[in-house]
Amino acid sequence: MDAVCTKKGKNEMDYVTHLKPDGTYQPLREHEENVAALAGEFAAAFGAQEHGHRTGLLHDIGKYSANGQKRQRDPAHTAKVDHASAGAQIAARLGDYYAACAVAGHHSGLPDWGDDSNDGGGTLCARLNKCLTGGNDPSAWKTEIEIPAKVRFPAWLAAEKDARRLAMYTRMLFSCLVDADYLDTETAIQGGQPRGEGETPERLLEKLNAHVVPWLEAPANDLCAKRSAILARCLRGGEDKRGLYTLTVPTGGGKTLSSLAFALSHAAKHGMKRVLSLIHI
């Protein structure tokens, strides 16, 4: 395997992250590898397992700096440390600006791009231009982590590189990384107890159907009858072929529940794993 570096044997100190309930720390290398495995698993759903895995390895490399370790061991008396820019810089040197964006923003959110003149602030260019020397030098990561120099990207990404497709891919990779990081952190600080599996769309649809049966069978008034008709149509419509649909219903027509009914029905019918609700604020 081509790699940016190879592990150099036993390190001179223990590099740590999250304080656990028993008073010990999670090894930083363990966290990096766990997040890489999870991010790769999540990204496999859209053909990016290798890319997700490498992004996970990159995400907390900045914690290998002396200041990063001081912060992990004594957060009450140590200033916050930017531990994300280091991994973003390595990703950029590999030509991987998808991962650079995801890593730079895995706590603060995806950054604006900025321009090469930025030498401060939160833009991606500013983060990539940041000088990481002295106590912020993270190069000790080379004693523990091996970063693949090359990974396979999804074929669909290379097929048509329009801006919307690239932006969506960056967001998907970012989401995989953030979920993986939070899940492994949660497991560590809860004493090794991983979060249980959530309900499947099929099970949620069963619960929804049980909840709305009385409304469908005996609507209380004319308005409720109209709402029930809309709801029933959405439940049936969810079984149509997989695709993009719109729902046009007047105010008071029960759009919230009916749209949920369609989404769960559609997900259950087509083996989809998640329902996302997007709300304008």
In which residue ranges do the predicted regions lie?
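Walker A/P-loop
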Residues: 242-262
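Short, hydrophobic/aromatic alpha-helical segments in well-folded domains
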Residues: 38, 233, 262-263
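Hydrophobic helix-cap positions at the C-terminus of alpha-helices
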Residues: 42, 46, 237, 266-267
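Conserved SF1/SF2 helicase motif Ia
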Residues: 265-279
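Residue-level preference for the first positions of well-ordered beta-strands
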Residues: 51, 244-246, 274-276
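Accessory nucleic-acid engagement/destabilization modules that flank
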Residues: 3-211
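Conserved pre-motif I regulatory segment
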Residues: 215-244
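Conserved small/polar residues in nucleotide/adenosyl-binding loops
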Residues: 181, 279-281
